[in-house]
């Protein structure tokens, strides 16, 4: 068959299997270079060098067969990446090298030795882990991934990057970076203003290491950073201030004694006065212990000018702390303390974040996929959740950025610029003000719901909540990985953990009560036995509550999906409650709603398809013909662990928790858990599904009344009388697949628009993916939805005779917000014994190999029928009838109408909303001349230039004084006008593209030729 160019993106080439190999002689040369670098350049001891050489040798064969799968694809760069990854793994997992004194090596040393930056390192490291996972497990044990702490360190880097920018912005607003008026008649050398900046960052880093856990949450770290700002305000010379303490709106909290500094900072940075006061106290203690400074008995008497018009209550002044003659010494002492305290076992030197020019930082973002940071720009397909997105503004939604007349971006203390840090602080304020004051026990109304069940379930529910939350919020989750310190870090972690546990418990009871109230209105009765006695439902609710608390504080050591493992549920289980949880908590901040929407996308795109997902336990009932493949791949979920097993595993004390009256009933909600496709049940249609938003992709006529919530979690194996006798599993799987189809539609539209494909091609791609969902569901098993979409686009391009290569598709995909390189670099396959390549068992291949060896053999009949323009043949209809829950495959619908991104309020003072234009609309509305006045994300007005630089160019053009020819037209163009324009364009291009397609259109394989 004819071939086409292999995909590539951003300069990297993705080739088929067997490409990019080098000979054995090249491998030997690599070993020599690696050994020489370990000994001469890095000076590693014999133990570390021996371990590194062992890992390098055992993974060398994988490296030689994957020479184009990392970085730009050049052998030299791939060798540098691979060597760096090997050394990092040895430094984290090896038996020695826990510190510099043991001959260890830090991540910074590794990066500098191989001329890499931190952004590229973390982007490429997951690919290394996928390929070398079996080798690492053999050398270091099955828990190597947990001990490597790669995700935690990456999230920590993201936090530090955000905090450093937050600190720089705050410092520049409060102080001068350059001393324009140095003091006269000073015998000592003038202290540079930048030295004060460095002092603040170093003091913060020492505070994090000595007082907080090594991987502390973002909110606690921000409190510590604000406490450092308070110390700087009190001690930095007045001449370096950028504000007038009496007149600045940033210090609005005043009393007869002057400005209340702590209260003013709390208002400005959305911190808690109690937490900030504690952080300031810890900072002062460090100054006494490390810098050996003594606090003045009366702060106001020690320094009149710096504390003038400031209420000294709660503040401490240290004489000579930041005086010019002692600043240099203070910096040296902090540097020494930091170097002595930092754990060098693969760690970063966090001082580099104060230097924007540091080559190790690199450029780009690490937040996508690794850690969800609210407040960042959201692209269309992230905003348009496959579930019914509920993103209405809430009272706690943060204010928007406002351009200040002074040019510093601050309208007032209440109009700080929106950043991920400020958004996290605002969301934490919601927890503090709305959830924390609630009682930690069920309310009277909720207790009445519990007692109205066939058996009072109060003790069961409170016991379960105590055990599950105890498993999530344990010291082992947050406090065990800390730096050696003489201070009481464990005690601080225990207090913090208990506070977060209480917040999750209160949120759980609050939302549960709201759900029960809504259910009684639907059922016209108070008996909610089926819902309130369901074990899986409660665990999902507790997990959702805990996840929101963890997401609010931006914890590093308990990032999603950690809550799933702790609670014993799967991603498919959690997906059932997300929409309902959001609907029943009216005060939930917008950013937390977005967080849940993004989680649902992750669940649908890949996590629900992973091995061990409970989705397969329902699918094996709904589609009996898939049972052989599900069992062959071993995809079924294990039984949900009992509460007693969870308590024993996490050493949770049951003292104070009510006993479980009937131990056998603990498993009753899951007693019909699917292990065989021949059982039966009485579940009604899923209440979490809005009938207007989700319909089964294979039965669009289901329009039943919204059923009660308690029907969502019953066993999937009995007939459902509300749906014409179909099994509950069939209804549930239909709902799930409809969400998959909607998510696919969103992703397909975004990528097809970027590739500038016609509407007809877009609809063909969507129709093909729909057919795969219905008839070839097994293609999704253990894979990512984007892998199927990428292959579908290329397949449709081939039958449509478009000059579109896989290389161009991947290049466009890499610009999408949801892109992860692993999607096209590593696709799961399970070779059957009859495979033509002779391989057997599990493997991960590039997307071209998957397309040629798996996708095309499976989907070729569908592609041929799609190219011929005919409906599925009789054989396929009969196959769908056997596989699916419905008697026949319906006619595929046209591409669904999808909403644009929700409009956002951009002004705190005026009701001004902005709804971003999609690429297709923007290209239609803007002429070539007018496009130069707009800066678009992902597209520059000039080659090789970022949108941020575009803004400067645009401002310069607008302020140049040149007359604009013609009159500006500010008329609002409706979506209808745009749609008509696009429809005309698409119709014309589609007609031209598909005019010559016949039933004999060949389905071509993709070959790795350039």
UniProtKB/Swiss-Prot annotation:
Renumbered residue ranges of the record's region Spacer: 620-730
Gene Ontology terms: cellular component: chromatin; nucleus; transcription regulator complex
Region (Pocket) location: 419-861
Keyword Transcription set for record: yes
Chain spans, region Domain A: 419-619
GO MF, one example: RNA polymerase II transcription regulatory region sequence-specific DNA binding
Family annotation (Pfam families): DUF3452, RB_A, RB_B
SUPFAM superfamilies for the chain: Cyclin-like
Region (Disordered): 1-23, 657-679, 868-898
InterPro entries in alphabetical order: Cyclin-like_sf, RB_A, RB_B, RB_C, RB_fam, RB_N
Location(s) in or outside the cell: Nucleus
General function of this protein: Regulator of biological processes that recruits a histone deacetylase to control gene transcription. May play a role in the entry into mitosis, negatively regulating the cell proliferation. Formation of stable complexes with geminiviridae replication-associated proteins may create a cellular environment which favors viral DNA replication.
Family: Belongs to the retinoblastoma protein (RB) family.
Protein name, per record: Retinoblastoma-related protein 1
Organism: Oryza sativa subsp. indica (Rice)
